[in-house]
Amino acid sequence: MKVDLTGLRREFTQSGLNRTDLDNSPFGQFNLWFEQAQKADIIEPSAMSLATSDNNEIGIRTVLLKYFDMYGFVFFTNYNSKKSKELQSNPNVALLFPWLVLERQVKISGYVEKISMLESLKYFSSRPKASQLGSWASQQSSSLSSRKVLLSQFELMKVKFSNGKVPLPDFWGGYRVVPLKIEFWQGRENRLHDRFIYQLNKGKWRIERLAP
């Protein structure tokens, strides 16, 4: 079966991106674009694709950015999951934010490092109790015979932690993606898109325009 999609074509109509528009810091530029994405009609602007590799196998999935600062971009997961095992084997990763409503995307390349337990605890404590229980109930990436098994485990956790606070699992926490390259892409007419990349060189960020 062949499905022909060559007729699916639309022109990009948003305004362009010039060198003079850019913040000197990629984090400042990301913050500006992220704020604009939040105001746009985007369902989940913090959703990002996380690409990993391990033993010549490429993995990709969507995770949620929980916060960022001048040190990197933080997400949370189960440390026993398939993605975490890949990260332990090869910490080099890439992120992609596809803000298609704005005809934009941001690509980030770098490496991951675990955040501290205290930092993970601070975020875990802010989550709804049901989400905290879900972290305990799910053995992420393991095989399930049915959804009923997962729901039964969730009910067990509700009983186990019915009194008091839900503790942070020792197998759950955050990773920080430390960026080495951050590219900002803005769609333009005739596919002559604007691309600017920030590259870290001897502790300083260098900005360069790339051909589309």
Curated annotation (Swiss-Prot):
Substrate binds at K66, Y123, R127, S131, R191, L192, H193. InterPro entries: Pyridox_Oxase, Pyridox_Oxase_CS, Pyridox_Oxase_N, Pyridoxamine_oxidase_dimer_C, Split_barrel_FMN-bd. Its EC number is 1.4.3.5. Pathway: Cofactor metabolism; pyridoxal 5'-phosphate salvage; pyridoxal 5'-phosphate from pyridoxamine 5'-phosphate: step 1/1; Cofactor metabolism; pyridoxal 5'-phosphate salvage; pyridoxal 5'-phosphate from pyridoxine 5'-phosphate: step 1/1. Binds 1 FMN per subunit. Gene3D superfamilies: Electron Transport, Fmn-binding Protein, Chain A. GO terms for biological process: pyridoxine biosynthetic process. FMN binds at residues 61-66, 76-77, 82-83, 105, 140-141, 185, 195. Keywords: Flavoprotein, FMN, Oxidoreductase, Pyridoxine biosynthesis. It comes from the Bacteria. GO terms for molecular function: FMN binding; pyridoxamine phosphate oxidase activity. Catalyzes the oxidation of either pyridoxine 5'-phosphate (PNP) or pyridoxamine 5'-phosphate (PMP) into pyridoxal 5'-phosphate (PLP). Homodimer. PANTHER family: PYRIDOXINE-5'-PHOSPHATE OXIDASE, PYRIDOXINE-5-PHOSPHATE OXIDASE. Belongs to the pyridoxamine 5'-phosphate oxidase family. This is Pyridoxine/pyridoxamine 5'-phosphate oxidase.
